[in-house]
Curated annotation (Swiss-Prot):
Subunit structure: Homotetramer.
Keywords linked to the UniProt accession: Hydrolase
Molecular functions (GO terms): glutaminase activity
Name of the protein in question: Glutaminase
Membership in a protein family: Belongs to the glutaminase family.
Taxonomic classification: Bacteria, Pseudomonadati, Pseudomonadota, Alphaproteobacteria, Hyphomicrobiales
UniProt xrefs under Pfam families: Glutaminase
Entry superkingdom: Bacteria
Sites where the protein binds substrate: 66, 116, 162, 169, 193, 245, 263
UniProt keyword annotation of Hydrolase present: yes
Reactions accelerated catalytically: L-glutamine + H2O = L-glutamate + NH4(+)
EC number: 3.5.1.2
Amino acid sequence: MSNQLLDRVVAEIADEMAQRADRGEVASYIPELARVDPKAFGLAVIGADGHIAAAGDADVPFSIQSISKVFTLTLALGKAGDRLWRRVGREPSGSAFNSIVQLEHERGIPRNPFINAGAIAVTDLILSGHQPREALGEILRFMQFLAGDSSIAIDEAVAKSEQRTGFRNAALANYMKSFGVLDNPVEYTLGVYFHHCAIAMSCRQLAMAGRFLAHNGQNPSTGLNVVSSERARRINALMLTCGHYDGSGEFAYRVGLPGKSGVGGGILAVAPGRASIAVWAPGLDAAGNSHLGRVALEGLTKRMGWSIFGV
């Protein structure tokens, strides 16, 4: 892969996105997110050799929201291994990210770890045996370690905004608690959940944190194995099939990469063996995924030939 080509493609995509009028709608149900500039756009791509191509607002921190679920899943699998799958499934939901419908049909077991109910169950596992502050500290330190940046922090204003308005998440958690899926007090689990979703990172930091998923579980910056190659492959598989809620099929069809979105407008995408990619554009589509983020990634994979399904 030519670094000059990558630099040019990333710059071209950023210029193209700046001209787009169809930007989607900024999330309004979390008051703090509603204040974000809808014209923001950032893109960062880190190649296998460590070269970084970045453009636009790639160094502006944003609320990663559900992208944090990739990293909490990684932590939970490290703690519990396959025992995790007793409390959460691995199937696409086909429903909105905060839907309670399937929980009713499936006796409190969430479909996958990337919908809200599934991520709450994963958070509960990480919390077990710890105080909420300890569990949250572990998650934050893990993110800082992966990104190689100790300045990464939680946006307390966003976390408090989510706590004040997170009634559906409270309903999901209480419903799972009634089936014994959650071990800890609901308010503790939700507190940790809201706070790790409120971690703020830039595209550059997020792409750095995701590099282990592009390189068989190894962090190329340190040479350390974060997870086994098998586990990295399986996390990527879940990102491909479940990472964009009920828009996961559309994302796979158009982009052709494992990816995880967040309602803050970010997307972390993985080109296995090639690159870790983070894009941010706050305007969302009807499924709650970044509209221009998806468009930008589609352009990137086409021009670089990175779709896992072929050029």
